[in-house]
A protein has these predicted regions:
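Catalytic nucleophile serine of serine hydrolases
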Residues: 97
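Exposed beta-strand and adjacent loop surfaces of beta-rich binding modules
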Residues: 111
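Extended, subdomain-level signal for the structured scaffold at the beginning of enzyme domains
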Residues: 1-89, 93, 102-108, 121-163
Length: 163
């Protein structure tokens, strides 16, 4: 799970992580720093790894957590490259809230059904996605969610893609 160094959306990290752990999956938390990351509502997380050190051998699913801080990855060639490599290597690639903008800017949503927090709709459309506005969308190993209320369903859809 990739979180922003600050202002990630707490429940979009905590709820999927809880679902993944409850279902026997290991969770690695990555960020752009190894210093403590603080969510919008005060959740403190010390990342396990700098996202720049991640390789697709480290995970089966890549999850970009939303919240305003996720914008630090919007134009990150490293984040885009990681997402593209994960997809090419058959991994599940996912993002929630505003974070699907990262996948769009990486070119992964071209011709795909996707959703996003309403502020990101235009970015998805510019990237060639078919924006649905649904809480969660799945299209060919790419899972997108539109915000915190969808966090648990989003996690379940990510896990379904792992089967």
């Amino acid at each position: 799970m990739v979180i922003a160094k600050s202002n990630f959306r707490d429940e979009e990290y905590l709820h999927p992580k809880e679902e993944f752990l409850r279902n026997g999956h290991e969770v690695i938390t990555a960020s752009s720093t190894l210093k403590e990351s603080i969510g919008r509502f005060g959740t403190k997380v010390t990342p396990d790894i700098d996202y720049k050190e991640l390789t697709t051998d480290d995970f089966d699913a890549l999850v970009f957590v939303g919240g305003g801080g996720a914008s630090e990855y919007f134009d990150s060639s490293l984040a885009h490259g990681l997402a593209r490599e994960a997809y090419r290597n058959g991994k599940v690639v996912s993002a929630i809230c505003i974070a699907p903008v990262i996948l769009s800017k990486a070119g992964l949503l071209q011709g795909k059904k996707a959703t996003v927090f309403p502020d990101g709709e235009n970015d998805l459309i510019k990237g060639g996605a078919f924006y649905t506005g649904n809480p969660v969308e799945v299209d060919d190993r790419i899972v997108t969610g539109n915000g915190p209320d969808a966090a648990r369903d989003f996690a379940k859809k990510v896990m379904e893609q792992l089967k």
